[in-house]
């Protein structure tokens, strides 16, 4: 955790929350059901700071990260509570975290890489007994086989910086999402063989975006610029984001 600049990170997040929260609260629905309004020990900006800092750390699981923070760095967040209490509190930060990510995405440089990765919510044998994401998660297929859950569609630039992202049910075809995700991009978009589609190529080309993919084994050889071949070899960069 020594590599994390906590003060700078918190100031950035807190400045965002001061702008975001007033607008967010106006959109929240009210209910006649009365709830206990017990004050949380941490404010929204503190919760978001802890969640974001975890992704900058080298610790594998969030539980170990939080317990270490609780044991050795409690002075940074005096209002810290138990791990189980924080997990229940973390839910309130989901929408603000998505908004924060969207406001801090990078700009298109002319070279973009697209890919999708499965987010599995349970083992295939437990699909019918799964309740948490019932009605939301769907069966899908990836290069690793069939899964039950969601798909994270991601576009980055050549530096590994996020340009666009979207979470969909697992049964959504990757090509159906590319058009929406790439609406603000120009130049070249590099993808794997799963994005081969003449319809998608023409759609993107009309907007000034050229889709570049590798050819399948059963396809005829085609001419490709050397620079494009080299960038396709670096496409694995997106898998490390």
Predicted stretch roles:
Residues 1-241:
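Short alpha-helical elements
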